[in-house]
């Protein structure tokens, strides 16, 4: 429809054609109003029954809500209309008629549970609050991409079907690949590192990851979006600097470019961009501060992973984004480098929101012999990862990086109760369709 005008661009006095969904119809007797909705907003269509063609009136008032229609008419000033403008139609066409009974109410007047919403995601997205979440998500990814480019990164796309898992273990989805066993990739980690050895030096990727985790919680998914960064010739502290930069840029992009969406969600007044200097807390300090809160039934000891309740207790204590550094080597992956002066401490770090972990990263082990030793210490066969390890014999620079959960970033940024609200079509233990 080349002659179509968006509702937000309608100017009084013009004869225009608008098209969209029937949001609401109000019949007041001699006069009736239809509210038309498109991606830019809404506009009022006025039907004066005694002064208009009967066919136009009947078509406009009999069409079911959420049908798709096209209307041609003259736009007039009308201060009482929702947008101060209304259209008096001279022609109307029903492009697609909707069922009279819908599985949920896109106007939002009748609430639906999350399962019903996800079963009917297309209808759900017609609600302005839901659409706002995904417009903000789009801005988060755009801002992250721009930030990576400002850091001198090259965008890459790594395989999602692999012969071996990044970290081994059971959190893998097996598939049959032309008669051979293969897996859906749980992380682009190993391929990112290969790109460091290629000479690209600094790369990023925004793409899907797959984890066959049994978790069924409001913050876990089995298919998620990972925002990944890897750079040569930096250490773990400089990788944390880059993490702060990208996360802050995402918030800044939303603050500058999503004012309407934040207003729709009731978040504009309270939305703030974090300072680009997150506190850095050692693992030892973290467990001491968690224990001091008294929130856990049992005290944490060195070598324990941090439970969800512990993360929340520490987050409430810190009150902002922060890093946990200097984790025990024994609980970090084989590719994370240890500190040179203390082999019991890794250079691994996690970046936390007060509610949950967002980022995992660290300096990588770039020395071939140490890398192979790390495989063996974690019970992995280095021969199965030969495509990866052999490149470390050909000249691999020191490097560091991280991976950021895209959905978790949006979830925590907007205060969503369930991570599935930040995904168009979530994949979890119960949901494979739509």
Swiss-Prot record:
Residues 189-192 are annotated as: Aspartate. It comes from the Archaea. Belongs to the class-II aminoacyl-tRNA synthetase family. Type 2 subfamily. Mg(2+) 2 binds at residues 357, 360. Aspartyl-tRNA synthetase with relaxed tRNA specificity since it is able to aspartylate not only its cognate tRNA(Asp) but also tRNA(Asn). Reaction proceeds in two steps: L-aspartate is first activated by ATP to form Asp-AMP and then transferred to the acceptor end of tRNA(Asp/Asn). This is Aspartate--tRNA(Asp/Asn) ligase. The record marks 82 as: Important for tRNA non-discrimination. PROSITE patterns: AA_TRNA_LIGASE_II (PS50862). It comes from Haloquadratum walsbyi (strain DSM 16790 / HBSQ001). Mg(2+) 3 binds at residue 357. It is found in: Cytoplasm. Pfam families: tRNA-synt_2 (PF00152), tRNA_anti-codon (PF01336). GO terms for cellular component: aminoacyl-tRNA synthetase multienzyme complex; cytosol. It catalyses: tRNA(Asx) + L-aspartate + ATP = L-aspartyl-tRNA(Asx) + AMP + diphosphate. Its cofactor is Mg(2+). ATP binds at residues 211-213, 219-221, 357, 405-408. InterPro entries: Aa-tRNA-synt_II (IPR004364), aa-tRNA-synth_II (IPR006195), aa-tRNA-synth_II/BPL/LPL (IPR045864), Asp-tRNA_synthase_2 (IPR004523), Asp/Asn-tRNA-synth_IIb (IPR002312), NA-bd_OB-fold (IPR012340), NA-bd_OB_tRNA (IPR004365).
């Amino acid at each position: 429809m080349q002659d179509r005008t968006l509702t937000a661009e309608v100017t009084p006095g013009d004869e225009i054609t608008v098209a969209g969904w029937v949001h609401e119809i109000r019949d007041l007797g001699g006069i009736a109003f239809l509210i038309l909705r498109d991606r830019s907003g809404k506009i009022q269509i006025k039907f004066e029954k005694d002064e208009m063609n009967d066919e136009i009136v009947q078509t406009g008032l009999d069409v079911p809500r959420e049908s798709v229609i096209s209307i041609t008419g003259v736009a007039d000033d009308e201060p009482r209309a929702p947008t101060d403008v209304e259209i008096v139609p001279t022609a109307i066409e029903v492009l697609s008629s909707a069922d009279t009974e819908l599985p949920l109410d896109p106007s939002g007047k009748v609430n639906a549970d999350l399962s019903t919403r996800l079963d009917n995601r297309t209808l759900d997205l017609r609600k302005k609050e839901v659409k706002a979440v995904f417009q903000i998500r789009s801005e988060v990814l755009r801002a992250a991409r721009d930030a990576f480019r400002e850091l001198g990164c090259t965008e890459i796309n790594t395989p999602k079907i692999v012969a071996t898992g990044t970290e081994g273990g059971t959190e893998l989805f097996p598939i049959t690949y032309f008669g051979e066993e293969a897996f859906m990739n749980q992380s682009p980690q190993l391929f990112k590192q290969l790109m460091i050895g290629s000479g690209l030096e600094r790369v990023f990727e925004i793409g899907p990851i797959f984890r066959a985790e049994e978790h069924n919680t409001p913050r876990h998914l089995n298919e998620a979006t990972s925002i990944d960064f890897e750079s040569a010739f930096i250490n773990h502290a400089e990788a944390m600097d880059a993490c702060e930069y990208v996360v802050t840029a995402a918030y800044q992009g939303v603050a500058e470019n999503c004012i309407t969406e934040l207003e729709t969600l009731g978040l504009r007044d309270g939305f703030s961009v974090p300072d680009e200097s997150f506190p850095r807390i050692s693992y030892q300090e973290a467990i001491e501060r968690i224990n001091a809160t008294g929130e856990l039934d049992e005290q944490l000891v060195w070598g324990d992973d941090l439970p969800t309740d512990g993360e929340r207790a520490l987050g409430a204590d810190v009150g902002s984004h922060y890093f946990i550094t200097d984790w025990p080597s024994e609980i970090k992956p084989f590719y994370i480098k240890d500190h040179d002066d203390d082999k019991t401490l890794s250079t691994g770090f996690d970046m936390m929101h007060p509610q949950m972990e967002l980022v995992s990263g660290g300096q990588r082990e770039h020395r071939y012999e140490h890398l192979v030793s790390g495989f063996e210490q974690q019970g992995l066969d280095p021969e199965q990862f030969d495509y990866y390890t052999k490149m470390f014999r050909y000249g691999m620079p020191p490097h560091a990086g991280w991976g950021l959960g895209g959905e978790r970033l949006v979830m925590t940024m907007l205060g969503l109760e369930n991570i599935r609200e930040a995904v168009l079509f979530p994949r979890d233990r119960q949901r494979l369709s739509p």
